[in-house]
Swiss-Prot record:
Any single biological process term in GO: isoleucine biosynthetic process
GO molecular function: 2 iron, 2 sulfur cluster binding; dihydroxy-acid dehydratase activity; magnesium ion binding
Protein name: Dihydroxy-acid dehydratase
Quaternary organization: Homodimer.
Xref: InterPro entries: Dihydro-acid_dehy_C, DihydroxyA_deHydtase, DiOHA_6PGluconate_deHydtase_CS, ILV_EDD_C, ILV_EDD_N, IlvD/EDD_N
Chain positions recorded as [2Fe-2S] cluster binding sites: C122, C195
Entry's EC annotation: 4.2.1.9
Positions bound to Mg(2+): D81, D123, K124, E491
Needed co-factor(s): [2Fe-2S] cluster; Mg(2+)
Gene field: ilvD
UniProt family annotation: Belongs to the IlvD/Edd family.
Organism of origin: Buchnera aphidicola subsp. Diuraphis noxia
Enzymatic reactions: (2R)-2,3-dihydroxy-3-methylbutanoate = 3-methyl-2-oxobutanoate + H2O; (2R,3R)-2,3-dihydroxy-3-methylpentanoate = (S)-3-methyl-2-oxopentanoate + H2O
């Protein structure tokens, strides 16, 4: 049987000093016989998705202790992408993912921790923790803080739902009155929790369910609902249970790398495509797969995107549904249940419940479940009360949304589209691929051509859009915003939202080697690989060049001859030390960001560090 890792610091005569320090944290002789379980929290007063996690950490700690473990809590950093967006702060968001993963490794290995429960929620925190769990491969459970309730506002004598993207969009409308802008600002984000649409945070928390590292309900159960408290308690019990399962019974099936197999990654990607999740999830799944040493790449994603239907449409792809509505329709398990009935899933993947997927769906898919407690959990309803207190209300729907024909979650037969919500495009403009979220795009825009309007920074593009320099039919190209070129691969929510506010979102396209917020909609193509700073063809595009996009055929091409392309490559490389660099951009790059840029690979590799460079150090 494997020994507790923590015994290296709690057993043996030569560890008296370490034990003395452990005692100073409140431990005693009995505790030295138990597993030390880290509560990897991400509480922060900067982020509404994390503002309530201090209480959550205390709740989990108490339950771990009751269940026979020794809880030890520490925090990771957490950046709010919505607050960091629209200025140089967004350069730091993606690089923080690597720092989160590294900091967890440092604390866990320095203190010989036996297991960990990851309390995450927002955009880069869940991926960073997932990378760490797969790197360390100790018993791990994920539990998110839960989604925010959708905002509500009265317009034209009707109550409509709103969210963060509405606040950004309306703020960008030059003809909008200040009073209405303020009203939306006050109502768009009413509670603690991750922003209420199928943005990056909620997408990732749904994917941890599909992978099998979190309990059913994790991705969709509201932060404010009392049922979330039960989920925290159950997660705490689960981490103690699987920790003992591994160390007492040598059951390696409960370890992250056993659970997060290639088949589990495929299930997660299938879910992502079916629900039209954030394009950022692709970046993070590719990065996590490398930590798990799994061969999962853009080709796998492309293959899946061609056969998975789009069966769940949520904001920002529609204003009708938010995460609270997905939950009422059965949550992640409801979506997976429909995919399973169409034989589109790997059914034998395992999870932290020590069940395979098919067994889990029998219990948690509302179409199949006979368990009244589970059906009651999916009736959790928003309260519509402004609060930052977790599990503070217990409202319930009278009925569940079983409508698989016209409801929030649909059967594969009644899908919103037989094409999935995400697609990978290839061509001379993106030799290694690029990503588009098709969930919010009309079929009439699946084939699109137009002249390029080229910008070498997000700021430059935003100014052009707001000044009215972009017209219907244009393709906005924003380059040198990739992992290396930015550096940091900024999100482009402001450019896409401002195109929407200018009524250009359905008649223009945007292409970038940067990335998009989960709140992005419209004809927005990101993750162009190779990026401009890595000698990608996007660096060679000129104003007025025609770009051809064909989503149906999965093609994106710069419409110039091969001879012209080679001539442009020659001209660019003749600039020598100035080649493949933005020439007119004024941007301060800190040493921390330069370090990230030096090691960063393009988006098709998950924007992770180049291990070949590391091996040469």
């Amino acid at each position: 049987m494997p020994k507790y890792r923590s015994f290296k610091t709690t057993h043996g005569k030569n560890m008296s000093g370490a034990r003395s320090l452990w005692r100073a944290t409140g431990m005693n002789d009995e505790d030295f016989k138990k597993p030390i379980i880290a509560i990897v929290n991400s509480f922060s007063q900067f982020v509404p998705g994390h503002i309530h996690l201090k209480k959550v950490g205390e709740l989990i700690s108490d339950q771990i202790q009751k269940s026979g473990g020794v809880p030890k809590e520490f925090n990771t950093i957490a950046i709010d992408d919505g607050i960091a967006m629209g200025h140089s702060g967004m350069l730091y968001s993606l690089p923080s993912r690597e720092l989160i993963a590294d900091s967890i490794e440092y604390v866990i290995n320095a203190h010989c921790v036996d297991a960990m429960i990851c309390v995450s929620n927002c955009d880069k925190i869940t991926p960073g923790m997932l990378m760490a769990a797969l790197r360390l491969n100790i018993p791990s459970v994920f539990i998110s803080g839960g989604p925010m309730e959708a905002g509500k506002i009265r317009k034209n004598e009707k109550e409509i739902k709103i969210d963060l993207v509405d606040a950004i969009m309306i703020g960008g409308q030059s003809n909008q009155c200040k009073n209405f802008i303020k009203e939306v600002e006050l109502l768009a984000c009413p509670t603690c929790g991750s922003c209420s649409g199928m943005f990056t945070a909620n997408s990732m928390n749904c994917l941890t369910e599909a992978i099998g590292l979190s309990l059913p309900g994790n991705g969709t159960l509201l932060a404010t609902h009392v049922d979330r408290k039960n989920l925290f308690i159950k997660s705490a019990k689960t981490i103690v249970k699987i920790t003992k399962e591994y160390y007492h019974h040598n059951n390696k099936k409960v370890l992250p790398r056993s659970i997060a197999s290639k088949e589990s990654f495929e299930n997660a990607m299938i879910l992502d495509i079916a629900m039209g999740g954030s394009t950022n999830t692709i970046l993070h799944l590719l990065a996590a797969a490398q930590e798990a040493e799994i061969d999962f790449n853009m080709s796998n994603i492309d293959e899946l995107s061609r056969k998975i239907p789009h069966i769940c449409k949520v904001s920002p792809s529609t204003s009708l549904y938010h995460m609270e509505d997905v939950h009422r329709a059965g949550g992640v398990m409801g979506i997976l249940g429909e995919l399973n009935r169409a034989n589109l899933l790997n059914k034998q993947t395992q999870n932290i419940l020590q069940l395979n997927l098919e067994e889990t769906l029998k219990e948690y898919d509302i179409v199949l479940s006979k368990n009244p407690d589970i059906l009651k959990m999916f009736k959790a309803k928003p309260a519509g009360i402004r609060t930052i207190q977790p599990y503070s209300q217990e409202n319930r729907w009278l009925t569940l949304d079983y409508d698989r024909k016209t409801g929030c979650i649909r059967s594969c037969k009644n899908a919103y589209s037989q094409d999935g919500g995400l697609a990978v495009l290839y061509g001379n403009l993106a030799k290694n691929g690029c990503i588009i979220k098709t969930a919010g795009i009309k079929k009439s825009n699946y084939i699109f051509s137009g002249p390029a309007r080229v910008y070498e920074s997000q700021e430059e593009a935003v100014n052009a859009i707001l000044k009215g320099e972009i017209i219907s039919g244009d393709i906005v190209v924003i380059r040198y915003e990739g992992p290396k070129g930015g550096p940091g691969m900024q999100e482009m929510l402001y450019p896409t939202t401002y195109l929407k506010s200018m009524k250009l979102d359905k008649t223009c396209a945007l292409i970038t080697d940067g990335r998009f917020s989960g709140g992005t909609s419209g004809l927005s193509i990101g993750h162009v690989s190779p990026e401009a700073a890595n000698k990608g063809v996007i660096a060679l595009v000129k104003n007025g060049d025609i770009i051809n996009i064909d989503i149906t055929q999965r093609v994106i091409n710069l419409n110039i001859t091969e001879q012209e392309l080679q001539q442009r490559i020659f001209q660019e490389e003749s600039k020598k030390s100035l080649s493949y660099k933005p020439l007119n951009r004024k941007r301060h790059i800190s040493y921390a960001l330069k370090t990230y840029a030096f090691f960063a690979m393009s988006a098709d590799k998950g924007a992770v560090r180049d291990r070949q460079k590391l091996s040469k150090i």
